[in-house]
Every structure is written in C-alpha cells, then in structure tokens.
Amino acid sequence: MQVKNPKFEISAVSKKQYPKGDRPEIVLVGKSNVGKSSFINTMLGRKNLARTSNTPGKTRQINFYNVDDIFYFVDLPGYGYSKMSKEEKVTSGKFIEDYLQNGTNISLIILLLDIRHNPTADDMLMYDYILKSNLPFIVIGNKADKIAITKVDGEIDRIKKTLGISYTTCLPFSSERKIYGDKVWEVIEEKIK
C-alpha cells in the first residue's frame, strides 16, 4: 500500500475522545517497549509520526493515526512494564480491555511480540484475551533485525508453538531493516476492504 498523507489524529484518554465515524481500525497491542511506535513509523514511511522512547511505558493513552482517511492505526498502551505501580497497571489494563470490548470499528488486532524471546505470561494473557474476543488478529514477531536472518523462520515457529497457534497468521517484522512490511500490508489491506 502506498501511504501518502498519514497524520496523528488524537491521544484519547476516554471513549468520548475516540474519533467518530466508521473508519476501520488496525489495533496494535504488545508489551511496553516491544516497538509499536517504530512499527507504525515504518509502516507509514515516516520517521517521527509516532513518538518512540527508550523508556518503557511511555504510551499511557490510546493514540489514533489517520492513514490517508482510509483507516486508523490505533496504538494501545503497552502492558507488563514492571516499574508501573499496581494501580497504574490495573488502570491501564481496564483501559485496554474497555477499548477492545467496545471498539466498534476494529478490523484487525496486531499482537506485537519480541521475536528474540518467548512470549511472557502477560503476552499469553493478551493472546488468550484476543482469542476469546473473536476479533480478527495476527501475531508479529518484531525486532527481527536483532537476530540472524537465517533464524527468523525458526523463531516464528517457536512463538507459534509457545502460543499454540495453528491457524493464526504469525509474521516477522523489522523496523530497523524495513523488511517484511509487504506481507503485513497484504493482511491489513484484506481487512480494510
């Protein structure tokens, strides 16, 4: 997909701030610091549209990115950041859950995992939650640039085995090398038709 004019739309802290209308939403979920913002920037061909940080847990609201007035990338707060207080974790968890339960325009959920590591307990909980939601989703093994290209398929197989994936699409991705994005676009384009 050729993206011409993506733009940041809004950071929402409540449902009443969500964009109105029926534009499809491609929702990104994943642990803090898994690379959701870098994923958005790479997919949209922009360097700093989504703000990135080396500090986990920076995204505390839901960020909507308007992609050519066709669909939204929706960046949910990261989960599993150990330095968040219990209260912050509960609040963040409820915020994510409320959005996933009540989002009427969700066309696809993308669960981003770090390809280098086994899915964590938090990743497993999120995967199970998404599975039970009956919403369409894919799993992406992000940061594929951090491993040898010859090991990518094996790491994807390991993630699939750990999660028990048999039918869900599971793809590698690298913001650094800007590779594998074409396969992700194929899935997204199918869902936003």
Protein language model features and the residues they cover:
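Structured catalytic cores of enzymes that bind and process phosphorylated ligands/cofactors
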Residues: K31-V34, I40, T55, N63, ...
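Conserved G1/Walker A P-loop phosphate-binding module
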Residues: M1-K83, K193
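Conserved C-terminal guanine-recognition region of P-loop GTPase G domains, centered on the G4
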Residues: E97-T168
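Canonical P-loop GTPase G-domain recognition
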Residues: V3-K15, K146-K193
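Conserved nucleotide-sensing/catalytic segment adjacent to the nucleotide-binding pocket
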Residues: V67-I106
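Helical mechanochemical/support elements of P-loop NTPase systems and associated helical scaffolds
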Residues: N48, Q61, E88-S92, P119-D122, ...
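Conserved nucleotide-binding/hydrolysis micro-motifs of P-loop NTPases
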Residues: K58, F71, G78-Y81, R116-N118, ...
